Amino acid sequence: MSRLLQFCSSLLRHRVVLFSKPGHSGRLSHSESPQNQVLTPTESVVGIVVFFATFFIPAAYVMSNLKFFKGE
């Protein structure tokens, strides 16, 4: 086993990252199957609020201070 794979497996403990799997052109793959977890409504609401706040708060700041952002 190469040193990189030993290093990765020591970091991830139970997961080994395979860098060059035959038949896959350079894609990263894990040795475990993905865990399917359903999002709760609270997690969905938090995600949506963060998404919209990320875009609308800076836009609202620029719109409220538009006279300072205009080039004169």
Swiss-Prot record:
Signal peptide: none annotated. Pathway: Energy metabolism; oxidative phosphorylation. It comes from the Eukaryota. The keyword Transmembrane helix applies. It is a single-pass membrane protein. SUPFAM superfamilies: Mitochondrial cytochrome c oxidase subunit VIIIb (aka IX) (SSF81431). One of its GO terms (cellular component) is mitochondrial inner membrane. One of its GO terms (biological process) is mitochondrial electron transport, cytochrome c to oxygen. It is found in: Mitochondrion inner membrane. Residues 30-40 are mitochondrial matrix. The chain crosses the membrane at residues 41-64. The keyword Isomerase does not apply. Coiled coil: none annotated. It holds the Pfam family COX8. Keywords: Membrane, Mitochondrion, Mitochondrion inner membrane, Transit peptide, Transmembrane, Transmembrane helix. Residues 1-29 form a transit peptide. Residues 65-72 are mitochondrial intermembrane. Component of the cytochrome c oxidase, the last enzyme in the mitochondrial electron transport chain which drives oxidative phosphorylation. The respiratory chain contains 3 multisubunit complexes succinate dehydrogenase (complex II, CII), ubiquinol-cytochrome c oxidoreductase (cytochrome b-c1 complex, complex III, CIII) and cytochrome c oxidase (complex IV, CIV), that cooperate to transfer electrons derived from NADH and succinate to molecular oxygen, creating an electrochemical gradient over the inner membrane that drives transmembrane transport and the ATP synthase. Belongs to the cytochrome c oxidase VIII family. Component of the cytochrome c oxidase (complex IV, CIV), a multisubunit enzyme composed of 14 subunits. The complex is composed of a catalytic core of 3 subunits MT-CO1, MT-CO2 and MT-CO3, encoded in the mitochondrial DNA, and 11 supernumerary subunits COX4I, COX5A, COX5B, COX6A, COX6B, COX6C, COX7A, COX7B, COX7C, COX8 and NDUFA4, which are encoded in the nuclear genome. This is Cytochrome c oxidase subunit 8C, mitochondrial. It comes from Rattus norvegicus. The gene is Cox8c.
